[in-house]
Amino acid sequence: TRRRPAALLDNPECLITLRNEDDSLFGGIAPEPSSKNLEKVRKVLDESKSEFRLGAIFDPDGDRIRFYDGTREIDMNQFGALAFHYMATWRKEQGCVAKSVATSNFVNIIAEKLGVPVMETPVGFKNFRPWLSRNAKQKALVAFEESDGISGLNNTLEKDAQFGLLIALEIMAVTGKNLGEYLDALYEEYGRFYPTRSGFEVDKSLVGAPLKAKVDAIATIAKPGAKVMVGKNEKTVKQLLTLDGVKIIFEDDSWMLVRPSGTEPKVRIYTECRNPDEKDPMFEAAKALFFKN
């Protein structure tokens, strides 16, 4: 995929490519679209005076993508919601939106207001196939996961960084806004969301079924209506999802997801809050629920 974007876009003069040479060791860095790997893109765009700017990094096999617009990094939690809003409001496409249970609920809030159904799935892009297939009764306008994978309407069943890039460019061309400007407009209307991902190790004896059982037990003490202390605040459980681990959604639309690793003695925790000061308390509260049972 190194030279595919240039070919797709007919080699425009405004396109600058980085790291497109053959290198089986990837320059000694982890081959992924991470914040750290955006540094060279940031440098190029920060020096640009152009009105419209878009930077993107792919992983080597071209299935994941992350953006930078000259002002901020935009990950898939944000871009997926942004792309869905564009497809539903500017292009006026009909269908649903698909996302994994570990992905930001930013898109849920947008979809609810627009009257569009959300298909929330276990982690893993293969789970989006029922809404990406050509004969789907209800097609996903976009399907995305927090680990920077996206696909969508009339595209491949697999995550596709090039689809993400083309949608981003279309958004800019049609709306006349950089991605960050579009995102700010959504924040103004729907509020901000602060997702995080972390985890911790447990005793090796818990690997496999015992660890899954311990995580599943959280559902028995965090049912809808239950109270959970998050820092100094008491939150009320609004909804409980057990598609993949246990996801607890609170009345203020913040949430926590506790998932067991299937192969390692690790527990993965995903949280999202509406106030950045709650990031650490949310993680500690999720961890406390795991050790409570």
Residue map of PLM features:
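Phosphate-binding chemistry for phosphorylated carbohydrates and sugar-nucleotides
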Residues: 1-192
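Catalytic-core signal marking the mid-to-C-terminal active-site face
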Residues: 177-293
